[in-house]
Amino acid sequence: MSRLEERLYREYLQFFEKAEAERRWSVFSDIPWEKVNRGASEELALCAETFCSVEMYLPDYVAGGINVVRDYFGQAWFQANWAYEESKHSLALTHYLVKSGKRSEEQMFDLQNRIFARK
C-alpha cells in the first residue's frame, strides 16, 4: 500500500466513524412524516420529482466511480458509503411526494419505469 493509499484509507476510517456517530439518519423514523405540508405547491413537488429522476441514475454513477477507484480500499469504500447516503435523499423526497399527496406510489413507479425505458 502506498503512502497515499494508506492516508486515504485512514481518512475514510475517520470519515466513517464520524458519520456513524453524528450524521446517520433514518428516512422512516427521523422525519416527522405526520407533519408533512400537504398544501405545498405543485412547483415544489415538481422540484422533488426532478431530483428523484436524476437520482434514479445513482447506481450508474456509483458503478462508474467504484470501477475507477476499485483498487484503493479507502476510496472504493468511501464511494460505496457516499452512495448509501445519497440514496436516502431520493428515498426521502419520494416519501415526501407520496405522504404529501402530491404523487401516488403508482405515479412514482411509473416515473421510474419511464426513465429506465430511456436507458
Feature roles, as predicted:
Residues 1-119:
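Non-heme di-metal
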